[in-house]
């Protein structure tokens, strides 16, 4: 069986995962990976002048394309310079896979030159992080990293690569499938819960859609616009949800919250149904929790179970991918009687 180094397998894995661009800054612990990348043309290298710029560039790439942003940095300061970017991606649900160089395994824990426990440092700001301790685990871990980053609620994954593991020869095979015990993200919408929510929507006198980043991340712009136009229900957005519907659309009111539009905040304060999709209800939009949407029943669709009823208690929780839920909604919704409500909003 053909054997190749871990460095070669990493480059092969990037190609298999369809990576077009890698944002990287070389250093001693990743120089051999850089050499392998130099030998091929499929994965293009974006070289910044600082690792912090690099991770923000990868973040921007992921947001604009919907693909996983990929980073490569060396150990020590190279790795620690990722921290702010990782925290940003984690907070905003941006899929990244960040590879960090690490000293050889026998030096880990011995205060070696440019050795830091980057997995430990970033544990609370990454979706998943791991140090590859065995060459035979490398392919599986890379495959899992991309899967975890892009599925469920997207987020950053950090893979720490000891220099000796990457130099070691091993299998050239890269896994085709992934099966992670205990990690089975739910994407299918519960039809019963969705129909309950739509029933409330049809009965409401002053309904309002709240679109968060989940609508944008799931690329649900077009189908969401169809639902809005079919129901004639007005829309407010979070900062992350801006762009989920054109800002010049007649049913779009504006951003909600402390940096939002007066009309949007008044609409939330006076609505009798707040139909929220893909938002965390953080303090920037809620203000005082006990005063938020005081007259409304609340529907909350979100792919992350932990986000539902964490800040605001909701009446109908639905765990689902935003696009999946909105697509199903489009099959059942009908035009709502919102003429009087829209007239009131226009006065604000």
Feature-to-residue mapping (PLM):
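Glycine-rich beta-alpha junction loops
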Residues: 27-29, 103, 161-167, 213-215, ...
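A short, small-residue-rich loop immediately preceding and capping a beta-strand
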Residues: 20-23, 43-46, 64-103, 210-213, ...
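Anionic-ligand anchoring segments at beta-strand to alpha-helix junctions in alpha/beta enzyme folds, i.e.
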Residues: 20-59, 72, 189, 196-274
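Conformationally flexible catalytic loops at phosphate/diphosphate-handling active centers
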Residues: 148-203, 341-342
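Short glycine/serine/threonine-rich phosphate/pyrophosphate-binding segments
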Residues: 30-32, 53-57, 77-86, 90, ...
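Phosphate/pyrophosphate-binding active-site segments
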Residues: 2, 136, 172, 199, ...
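Phosphate/diphosphate-binding loops
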Residues: 257-308, 316
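Conserved thiamine diphosphate
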Residues: 113-152, 270, 321, 325, ...
């Amino acid at each position: 069986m053909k054997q190749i180094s871990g460095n070669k397998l990493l480059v092969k894995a990037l190609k298999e995962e369809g990576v077009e661009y890698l944002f990287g800054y070389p250093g001693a612990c990743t120089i051999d990976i850089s050499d392998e990348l130099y030998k091929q043309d499929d994965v293009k290298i974006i070289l910044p002048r600082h690792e912090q710029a690099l991770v923000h560039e990868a973040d921007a790439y992921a947001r604009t394309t919907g693909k996983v942003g990929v980073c490569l940095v060396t150990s020590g300061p190279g790795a620690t310079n990722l921290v702010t970017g990782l925290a940003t991606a984690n907070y905003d649900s941006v899929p990244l896979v960040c590879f960090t160089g690490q000293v050889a395994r026998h030096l880990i824990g011995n205060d070696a030159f440019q050795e830091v426990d980057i997995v430990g440092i970033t544990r609370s700001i990454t979706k998943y992080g791991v140090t590859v301790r065995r060459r035979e685990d490398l392919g599986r871990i890379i495959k899992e990293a991309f899967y975890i980053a892009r599925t469920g609620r997207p987020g950053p994954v950090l893979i720490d690569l000891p220099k000796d593991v990457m130099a070691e020869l091993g299998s050239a095979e890269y896994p085709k499938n992934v099966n992670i015990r205990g990690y089975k993200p739910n994407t299918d919408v519960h039809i019963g819960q969705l129909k309950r929510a739509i029933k409330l929507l049809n009965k409401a006198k002053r309904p309002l859609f709240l679109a968060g980043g989940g609508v944008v991340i799931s690329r649900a712009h077009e189908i969401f616009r169809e639902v809005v136009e079919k129901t004639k229900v007005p829309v407010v957005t979070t900062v992350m949800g801006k762009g989920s519907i054109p800002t010049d659309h007649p049913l779009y009111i504006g951003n909600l919250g402390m940096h939002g539009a007066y009309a949007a905040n008044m609409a939330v304060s006076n609505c009798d149904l707040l139909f929220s999709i893909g938002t965390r209800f953080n303090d920037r939009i809620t203000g005082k929790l006990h005063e938020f949407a005081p007259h409304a029943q609340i529907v909350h669709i979100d792919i992350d179970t932990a986000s539902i009823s964490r800040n605001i208690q909701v009446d109908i929780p639905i765990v689902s991918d935003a696009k999946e839920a909105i697509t199903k909604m489009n099959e059942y919704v009908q035009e709502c009687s919102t003429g009087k409500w829209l007239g009131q909003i226009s006065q604000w």
